[in-house]
Structures are given as structure tokens and as C-alpha cells.
């Protein structure tokens, strides 16, 4: 039996639960409890504050955890970062009052910086030869300059809207983060086998993101050119049609390239193009 720790609430909770659901692990309604079992996979889900997850996994109370890489780096716990998950993206940046002139990291020499991430900030300042003091606070870091608590802040930035509304501007991107799957370093053989199954499912879900399945009819005379246009997984699937001189072509493309590919295919005679959403791709 595995035990996986995820965030109690918020966007990362929702995305973690959605990932589990996408890979066939149903935890519907489970966040009303502190600990719950999945009905269809040998796993328990433990709901915690995000900053507690690395320590709980390192100590072995949970086998696995889904948490931001920023929390892993800040807590410094000895865990295995198994894989990036492709969601929960953010950055931790230095920001200063909008009216201030910024000339580079030397700006922070002798300044006081408010943050909830003193370890990551300390490492950055040391690497850049900057001596600054810190005001370590939890929550509402962005109000610190206006409240006279600090000269600048070091905090999570997603869209930047919160900074703007508090009269701040981002001047240094220090740490890029996203959700990661972490594991205790001393998993049993049984736990490791279950983790491998989870990873297989996660990879199948991940490779299907941003993909579309194309089906079309195309003149046989244009087939070689169409194959060059379409990357597919290995090569496109080609099937003859009852109508002489025509075939059916199936392929997978990135969503970002879809309309460009369709334009090229139409130009060489493709007809009846169907675009389907992919649920899973099994590697």
C-alpha cells in the first residue's frame, strides 16, 4: 500500500486530484477527510499543508508526495524527485517598489527583503555576493514594502497581477518551479513496484496532453508528401479506401501545430479531415 501526500486545498490540490483521476485513481470527495483510501488502487491519500509534504515524505510517514519544487528546495529534505508533472508552474522572484530604479542585483546590498523562502533567497544572495537582511513572514508578503516592513520582497509570482496591485515590479526571476512527484528514499520492493505502475500511468497521461488525432482521406498520389508533413508517433497509419486512388491517413499532431498541418494537407488534396481529442497515449 502506498500513501501519497497532496495539498489540502487550492489550485495544486485540484490539479493533483485531477491527475489521480486521469490515471484511474478515484478520490472523489476525499478532501473532506484527513486520510482516505482509493477504491480502485492500493493507495491512501493524505491531505497536508504544502510546506509539510517534503518532511512527511522524507520521514516515511508518506511514501510519495505531490508538491511544488519550490517547497522541496526550501525545506531541504532528503527526498527523491521522481518526475516533473507539468502543472502548478510558478516562479519565485525579487520585486521592488515600482518607482525605484533597478540597476542589478547590487540594488539589494544592505536592503531588507521580506520572504517566505529564506533558504532559497539566502543561496541566491550568497551566489551573487550580496549582503542583505531578511524579514521572514508567512502570507501577504507583497504588502511588506508599503507597510514599512521591508524594502523589497522575494515571493511566488504567477501572473504578476498581485505585484502590480501592490505597486511592485518584478526585477529578478530566481527560481522556476512546477509540481513534482517526490518519494521516500527507502521504499520497499512492493512500494517501488506500485510507484512504477503510477509512473507508467502518469507518462501515458502526460504524453497525450496537447495532442490531437487526425483522420483524413487523401489521394494516393499525395501520400508521400502527406507523410512528410505529419510526424505521428512512429509513422502515420495508411489504409486503402474502396474508391480507387484514395486512402485514409491517421496521425497524431501537437495542438499548437494543428492548423498549420491542416492547411498543408488541404493544399495537397486532403478531404474529410476529422480532428479528435486524445484521452491517453500508452507508450
Predicted regions and their residues:
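Short, structured active-site "lid" loops
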Residues: 42-63
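Small-molecule-sensing regulatory modules
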Residues: 1-42, 67-80, 84-91, 99-283
Amino acid at each position: 500500500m502506498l500513501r501519497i501526500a497532496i495539498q489540502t486545498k487550492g489550485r495544486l490540490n485540484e490539479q493533483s486530484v485531477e491527475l489521480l483521476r486521469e490515471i484511474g485513481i478515484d478520490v472523489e470527495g476525499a478532501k473532506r477527510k484527513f486520510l482516505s483510501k482509493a477504491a480502485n488502487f492500493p493507495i491512501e491519500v493524505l491531505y497536508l499543508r504544502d510546506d509539510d509534504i517534503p518532511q512527511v515524505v522524507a520521514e516515511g510517514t508518506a511514501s510519495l508526495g505531490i508538491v511544488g519544487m519550490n517547497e522541496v528546495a526550501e525545506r531541504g529534505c532528503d527526498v527523491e524527485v521522481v518526475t516533473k508533472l507539468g502543472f502548478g508552474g510558478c516562479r519565485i522572484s525579487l520585486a521592488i517598489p515600482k518607482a525605484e530604479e533597478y540597476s542589478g542585483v547590487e540594488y539589494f546590498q544592505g536592503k531588507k527583503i521580506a520572504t517566505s523562502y529564506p533558504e532559497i533567497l539566502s543561496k541566491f544572495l550568497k551566489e551573487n555576493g550580496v549582503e542583505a537582511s531578511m524579514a521572514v513572514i508567512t502570507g501577504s508578503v507583497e504588502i511588506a514594502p508599503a507597510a514599512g516592513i521591508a524594502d523589497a520582497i522575494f515571493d511566488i509570482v504567477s501572473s504578476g497581477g498581485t505585484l502590480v496591485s501592490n505597486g511592485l515590479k518584478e526585477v529578478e526571476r530566481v527560481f522556476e518551479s512546477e509540481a513534482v512527484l517526490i518519494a521516500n528514499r527507502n521504499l520497499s520492493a512492493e512500494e517501488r513496484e506500485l510507484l512504477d505502475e503510477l509512473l507508467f500511468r502518469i507518462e501515458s497521461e502526460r504524453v497525450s496532453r496537447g495532442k490531437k488525432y487526425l483522420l483524413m482521406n487523401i489521394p494516393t498520389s499525395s501520400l508521400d508528401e502527406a507523410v512528410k508533413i505529419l510526424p505521428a508517433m512512429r509513422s502515420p497509419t495508411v489504409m486503402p479506401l474502396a474508391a480507387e486512388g484514395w486512402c485514409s491517413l491517421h496521425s497524431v499532431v501537437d495542438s499548437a501545430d494543428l492548423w498549420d498541418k491542416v492547411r498543408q494537407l488541404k493544399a495537397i488534396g486532403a478531404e474529410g479531415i476529422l480532428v479528435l481529442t486524445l484521452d491517453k497515449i500508452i507508450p
